[in-house]
Amino acid sequence: PIMNAIATQLSADDIANVAAYFATQTGATATAKSDFLPNLAKTSVKFPEGYQTTFRKYHTINFPATKQVRYYFANDMALRAAKDGKPLPDGSVLFTEVYSAKSGPDGKPLTGPDGFFVADQLLFYTAMAREAGWGKDIPEMLRNEDWNYAAFTTGKALRPVNQAECLACHKPLDKASYT
């Protein structure tokens, strides 16, 4: 997903130049793994304590491939801007609870009367938030204005994550405030 967002910004000549450059490089071993780039591993997003009472749930999505159901919440600033059809401003926070779906006897996710999977165990949280200057150290090809992304454990601890994956996935969504 990271390269898809970048590739859409490149011309055929750019792609040929990138391919030529990497063709001259020594290949990595099969087990090699690069460290995250520091400016993509760092996030300014904090766990929004008290979100259950200060944010509003605005969406639910089933994820059949991973047998998950996700509940989406937003703070008042984000909700007001969205309601007014405006870009989400600095101070906006979107937050997600990610649950495994309860399985039926056939192993398929159970669906509730609302059409959504029945939530089982909380797996982790994700968040995206923006403040002025947060995007300044992110390469332009991935930058989503000043949005930063984070994932948290069920204990609310920050999980190490490659923010580039989030940035790349959200990059094409510029007309919708990268959401």
Enumerate the predicted regions with their spans.
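Conserved hydrophobic/aromatic "anchor" residues
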Residues: Y21-F22
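Intrinsically disordered, low-complexity Ser/Thr-rich linker and spacer segments
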Residues: G27-T31
